[in-house]
Amino acid sequence: ISTSLNGDPLGISGIFITHAHIGHYAGLMFLGHESAATKSLNVFAMPRMEKFLRNNGPWSQLVDYKNIEILPLADQVWVELSGGIKVKPYQVPHRDEFSETVAFEVKSSKKSVLFLPDIDSWAKWKSEYGHSLQERVAAVDLAFLDATFFDNNELPGRDMSEIPHPRIVETMEVFDNLPESEKDKVYFIHLNHTNPARFFTSSAYKDISERGYKIANSNDRFCLD
C-alpha cells in the first residue's frame, strides 16, 4: 500500500472517531502491523473513546506499535487543522456503552458541514445537551444526518424502541415547514440494510425526494472550498 501511494499509507492524514460502535471504529484495525502499518497516524477521540482504544486489544496494539497517535477532543472545542480547516465535536445522546458519541461540525473559510451519523433522538439532544437540530443545521451549509431507519416497520419480531434512532419520517417532519433552502442542506446517511430508502425504486426513496431531501450515495464528494 505504501509503495502504491508514494509512501503515504492510505492517503489519510487523520481520522476523527464519533463513537465505539462497530461501524464507526472497527476500520482502525487495518492501520495495524498486519495491514497498512501506518506510522503515528493522527486519531482524534473523546476521553472515553481514547481510554477504550488504549485499554482494549487489538486497538491497544495500534498505540503500542505507534501505528496511531491519539489526540484528545473536548465537547464543543474547535480543533485547528492545516489548510484552514477546523473541527468541533458535539456530544449527542446515544447508547454509550463504551464511549461518548459525538457529531462533528467541519468548517473551512468558505463552507461548513454537520456530520451526525448516530443519535437516539432530536428531542433528547435538546433536553440533555441544549442543541436544537434546526439551529445546528441553520448554522451550516450541509448536514449529513442519521437515517438508520425509515420508519418503525423494518424489523419484524423486534421491539424497535430498543434501537433508538430518529426515523427518517420523523426528521422530515422537523424540516417540512422550513424554507426549501434548509431542506436542501439535508443528506440522509447511515442507512441500515433494512431501510427501503436505499433503493431508488422504493416508495420511501420517492417520498424523501419529493419532499426536498436527499440520500447520500457511495462515492459522493463534497468540497469545502
Protein language model features and the residues they cover:
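Core dinuclear metal-dependent hydrolase active-site scaffold
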Residues: 1-6, 70-136, 220-225
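Active-site neighborhood of phospho(di)ester-bond hydrolases with catalytic His/Asp-centered motifs
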Residues: 11-24, 28, 44-46, 115-119, ...
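Short, well-ordered alpha-helix to beta-strand connector turns
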Residues: 12, 40, 65-67, 139-141, ...
